[in-house]
């Protein structure tokens, strides 16, 4: 199975349909009202209704389980990505499969990340690693040291986020070998508005890198 692709920050139907046609596996709809990429549940529902293929993901930041479940039901999200500092008991009460984001600090150590994974593993389907930034919860456009997470990606299904683009995705896949990659700001012309030109350039690089990685894994002893 090849590396999967999630694109976050969807606010427009045209962008969602273009990404579906390009081969995205997941589309992320930000449910954090303070974000420039906020897509209210009703708007997300309208877009999801007209897009087939990618799984729609609601992206939440420090919401309670009841709020998350209500938005999931209203919008029709298939997964919930919890991108804040949600406690494990909230994660375990979410009614759909969960992607739990872990924010990687510049001084993080692999054992610290593993401890966080173990704290949440009973209540989640996937993990997502993103670069820590004290001023924002995501869409930083900054990458972290991917080597920190290589062993975690062998043990857990991990989405890799933070600063990925057409120029570095091949190196990211080779270094970490994640389950999926997650992009947002690097595919935009403005916050919440995707650039088809950037999408095309990334897809060319991503598909070539994913195919090369899959071939290498096939020939591994």
From Swiss-Prot:
It is an enzyme of class 5 (isomerase). Its EC number is 5.3.1.24. Keywords: Amino-acid biosynthesis, Aromatic amino acid biosynthesis, Isomerase, Tryptophan biosynthesis. One of its GO terms (molecular function) is phosphoribosylanthranilate isomerase activity. GO terms for biological process: L-tryptophan biosynthetic process. It comes from the Bacteria. Gene3D superfamilies: Aldolase class I. It catalyses: N-(5-phospho-beta-D-ribosyl)anthranilate = 1-(2-carboxyphenylamino)-1-deoxy-D-ribulose 5-phosphate. Pathway: Amino-acid biosynthesis; L-tryptophan biosynthesis; L-tryptophan from chorismate: step 3/5. It holds the Pfam family PRAI. The keyword Amino-acid biosynthesis applies. Belongs to the TrpF family. This is N-(5'-phosphoribosyl)anthranilate isomerase. It comes from Salinibacter ruber (strain DSM 13855 / M31). The gene is trpF.
